[in-house]
């Protein structure tokens, strides 16, 4: 069985550097990744097309600059983009296709697949390759996710899947979710992990063994919070288990070394807040804003994460961090 690898280094990795990757960094990594045989190289603001903003962070480059830079660097791999309806629009998708995007992935909250209907339909009308993912998948049951996936396929998605956005799932949770989806839809299934509880590689293997055919990851795990699935670990493990990735290991190890040298300020690690984020079920990308607001207010950041988890906060609601910090400070005084 062939497993397609979606390399999210230049998109999810943006979270780790506050969306400040430069054109030179994008070009350097994309060129290296293109030599590996990886199927898709994903690029953009960490939150996707149209997301560069005060609320979730201004990117160093515009979407146009990011996409054109990477497009020029790819000869073999497809270029992928990610978009969340509400941040991105049909106008953003139009531009992305004009800049040479090969694969568009639309993301929604795990119970809000209907938000992707218009965008997926439009993409299919354009003849574009359209995928869709359900985010924060720990917040929905396997049956609910399968129903949502069926809706996405009905809207035109040619591959569907789930993101463990908070790094909260364990292998048995992944197996149950992918198995339920596999029984209900016939298109390829996608899995995207975060490593808050140290489960990213194990969860990705569980997804593949349950029937997923497209797996996300990043060189050196470079991504939000505790990072993503570390591709240079996952790839040889998949091959050892008898799955084909089509990726040259030495070339990918070289790309990962380059990423460590040129893209990262500090390598991803599972620190105390990463663990708390995973346990609380809060999006990994909240780490920096929680630290900033909690630190300035003298509030324990761990308490902030658990309260955000209790409220079931999702990506895009970063403004509520300020509210939670203020309430915790008042309660302590």
From Swiss-Prot:
Pathways per UniProt: Aromatic compound metabolism; 3-phenylpropanoate degradation
Residue positions of the active site: 15 (proton acceptor)
Chain sites annotated for binding Mn(2+): 12, 192, 194
Domain Pyruvate carboxyltransferase stretches: 3-253
Pfam families registered for this protein in UniProt: DmpG_comm, HMGL-like
Signal peptide (residue range): none
Membrane-spanning ranges: none
Enzyme nomenclature, EC number: 4.1.3.39
Site (Transition state stabilizer): 11
SUPFAM superfamilies named among the record's database cross-references: Aldolase, post-HMGL domain-like
UniProt cross-references to InterPro entries, sorted A to Z: 2-IPM_HCS-like, 4OH_2_O-val_aldolase, Aldolase_TIM, DmpG_comm, DRE_TIM_HOA, PYR_CT
Reaction equations catalysed: (S)-4-hydroxy-2-oxopentanoate = acetaldehyde + pyruvate
Any one of the GO BP annotations: 3-phenylpropionate catabolic process
Molecular function per GO: 2-isopropylmalate synthase activity; 4-hydroxy-2-oxovalerate aldolase activity; manganese ion binding
Keyword vocabulary terms for this entry: Aromatic hydrocarbons catabolism, Lyase, Manganese, Metal-binding
Highest taxon listed in the record's lineage: Bacteria
Residues the record lists as binding substrate: 11-12, 165, 192
Family membership noted in the UniProt record: Belongs to the 4-hydroxy-2-oxovalerate aldolase family.
Function statement: Catalyzes the retro-aldol cleavage of 4-hydroxy-2-oxopentanoate to pyruvate and acetaldehyde. Is involved in the meta-cleavage pathway for the degradation of aromatic compounds.
Subunit structure: Interacts with MhpF.
Protein name per Swiss-Prot or TrEMBL: 4-hydroxy-2-oxovalerate aldolase
Annotated organism of origin: Serratia proteamaculans (strain 568)
Gene for this chain: mhpE
């Amino acid at each position: 069985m062939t497993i397609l690898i979606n390399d999210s280094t230049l998109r999810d990795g943006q979270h780790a550097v506050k969306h400040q990757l430069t054109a030179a960094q994008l070009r350097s990594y994309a060129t290296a990744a293109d030599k590996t045989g990886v199927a898709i190289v994903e690029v953009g603001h960490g939150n996707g097309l149209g997301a560069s903003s005060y609320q979730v962070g201004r990117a160093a480059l515009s979407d146009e600059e990011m996409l054109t830079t990477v497009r020029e660097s790819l000869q073999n791999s497809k270029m992928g983009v990610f978009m969340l309806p509400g941040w991105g629009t049909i106008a953003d998708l139009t531009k992305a296709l004009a800049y040479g995007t090969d694969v568009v992935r639309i993301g929604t909250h795990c119970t809000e697949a209907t938000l992707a209907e218009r965008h997926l339909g439009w993409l299919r009308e354009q003849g574009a390759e359209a995928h869709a993912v359900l985010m924060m998948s720990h917040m929905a049951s396997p049956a609910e996710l399968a129903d949502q996936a069926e809706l996405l396929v009905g809207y035109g998605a040619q591959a569907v899947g789930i993101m463990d956005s908070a790094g909260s799932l364990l292998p048995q949770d992944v197996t149950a979710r992918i198995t339920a989806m596999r029984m209900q839809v016939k298109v390829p299934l996608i899995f995207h992990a975060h490593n808050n509880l140290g489960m990213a590689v194990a969860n990705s293997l569980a997804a593949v063994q349950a029937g997923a055919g497209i797996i996300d990851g990043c060189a050196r795990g470079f991504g939000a919070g505790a990072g993503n699935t570390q591709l240079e670990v996952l790839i040889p493990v998949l091959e050892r288990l008898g799955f084909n990735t089509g990726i040259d290991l030495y070339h990918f190890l070289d790309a990962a070394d380059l990423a460590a040298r040129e893209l990262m300020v500090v390598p991803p690690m599972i620190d105390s807040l990463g663990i708390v984020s995973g346990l609380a079920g809060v999006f990994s990308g909240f780490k920096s804003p929680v630290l900033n607001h909690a630190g300035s207010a003298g509030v324990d950041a761990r308490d902030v994460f658990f309260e955000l988890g209790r409220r079931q906060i999702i990506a895009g609601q970063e403004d509520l961090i300020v509210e939670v910090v203020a309430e915790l400070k008042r309660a302590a005084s």
